Amino acid sequence: MPNITNNHTFNIVQLSDLHLTGDIGQAPSYQRFLAVFQTAKHLNPDLWLLTGDLVNDGNSDAYDWLFNQLQATKIPYLAVAGNHDVTHEIGIHLAHQERIHVPILPDRRLKNCFRYTFQAGHDWQILLLNSSVSGEIFGLLTHETLLWLDQTLTTHFEQTIIALHHHPTKVSSDWIDAHLLKNHQDFWHVIKKHAHVHTILCGHVHQVHTLHPLPAHQVQLLSCPSTDRQFMPFVDNFQIADTPAGCRMIQIDNKGIVSSYIQIVQNTHSFCLNNAN
């Protein structure tokens, strides 16, 4: 179990919605990721946490490239699937409702029903859930996954962070809220029973949100910017936002106090130009 010493924090860097596609290591999505990743390395992470939509077309070579980048840092990493990791989207130049979605198998290195523990003032656990559905954009947690979550929280009382791809609460954007976690009420029914759930991390929305969905519960829901492109928040129809890529830092000090901030990277476009050879 990783542990922190006095006057240090346990630092989790959340990376999400990479959408790696095109020439491996060279295409713009790779270069934008590398710009964010190089910045994130200087944040002294103790864990890389990737919350889905890593690769756009299921290319195993793209996953190999990504996981080689992570392994080279010698820092532990965890990753869950997003809808694009289990769905090949054909016709990306078309309107969303006109695209064809073909089911694909997830990479075997993506986690589901996985428990990771560390110490930071108190004992902590991170629970990874697969919310992706092959051939679909929306999310769903299977009965077996919800049962595992409930049983794990019942038998392990560590302070808990849960990571999944799909947002389990609406974010006031109609088009992306149509593709949230479909059985979110079942998910929250489990969470309500367990006061030691502290933070839920998600991707999918390409937006930054801090929400408190359960007024009588301490739990906070944090979403993460994409390392690729951002979606315009608080609009009913799909729009790309002219805002920087980035990642989320979650810090837990030796008193068990959690803080978080967004690290943005302004020069991803310049990074693409400088490395597109």
UniProtKB/Swiss-Prot annotation:
Its EC number(s): 3.1.4.-
Keywords tagged on the record: Hydrolase, Iron, Metal-binding, Nucleotide-binding
Positions annotated to bind Fe cation 2: 53, 83, 165, 204
Residues that, per the record, bind AMP: 19, 53, 83-84, 206
EC top class, as a word: hydrolase
Source domain of life: Bacteria
A single GO molecular function term of this UniProt record: nucleotide binding
Cofactor (UniProt): Fe(2+)
Origin organism lineage: Bacteria, Pseudomonadati, Pseudomonadota, Gammaproteobacteria, Moraxellales
Family, per entry: Belongs to the cyclic nucleotide phosphodiesterase class-III family.
Binding site for Fe cation 1: 17, 19, 53, 206
Name listed for the protein in its UniProt record: Probable cyclic nucleotide phosphodiesterase MCR_0369
Cofactor: record remark: Binds 2 Fe(2+) ions per subunit.
UniProt cross-references to InterPro entries, sorted A to Z: Calcineurin-like_PHP_ApaH, CNP_phosphodiesterase-III, Metallo-depent_PP-like
